[in-house]
Amino acid sequence: MISTQHPNPDRLMRWATYASVATAMLLILTKIIAWFLTDSVSIMATLIDSSLDMLASIVNLVAVSHALQPADSEHRFGHGKAEALAGMGQSMFIAGSAGILLLQAVERMINPKEAMAGIDVGLGVMIFSMLATMLLVGFQSYVIKHTDSTAIKADRLHYKTDLWVNGSVIIALILTFYNFSYFDPIVALGISIFILVSAWEIIRESIDLLMDHELPDEERKKIKKVILKTPRTQGCHDLRTRRSGNMIFIQFHLELDATLSLLEAHSIADGVEQELKSLFSNVEVIIHEDPVTL
């Protein structure tokens, strides 16, 4: 995804991490109360999920702060891969929580409990959780639109999943109140599957970043289109792209008329570079000029 320009994308990313941690802390406190009053395994599932979300969000906060540091003499390409490392750490937290939930859900299916007390409080807490999560996801989506941050996308993935999870728990609480006791652990099983899917998505994207995976074909096509539409360019080859944090790196060979002077060729290459910088919010471009005979 190509992010749109914003006057201060770094500040947006920091605010997104602060908002994520604050929201997770608020949800944990409210869910502890709801679980204590209802003894619902579904609410316990969301409590564990929110607790791990907070740990992951704290990891994100630290990683984003490090990733936004400027390049130095020992890290010439910046610190952007700290985001991918954070994503790998998050996936471990998430996969672990899925295992805990599976065990708890199976135990509750073997030993079901009667209708729980405090259902009204539990419902109120889960509805509040959905509203708070919707606000956070909306803000994270805005930040991603302007930064395309992998760490923020991973965090948003948690909370988008939580919206489905919280909705399922609300249904489970209502049905359990009417003595459909098996529905509560069934929802917990479904939640664990959602969590595992989320972990896989984060792992896949993190590995792509760490292994310098090429940008998607759609973005590579847009890059080539920008290059070829620039006046006096004859073509390009050996296009290589990668992403590190919120930085994009592009390098390619630019084919130019062999009769051009060095100054003219350099001026054309500069024009291509500026066009690419207007397409991406954070990009570093390396161009090798190749002479071709017309």
Regions found by a protein language model. Give the residues of each.
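Alpha-helical transmembrane cores and adjacent cytosolic helix/loop segments
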Residues: 1-220
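Peripheral (non-transmembrane) domains and long loops of multi-pass membrane proteins
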Residues: 1-17, 74, 79-82, 198-294
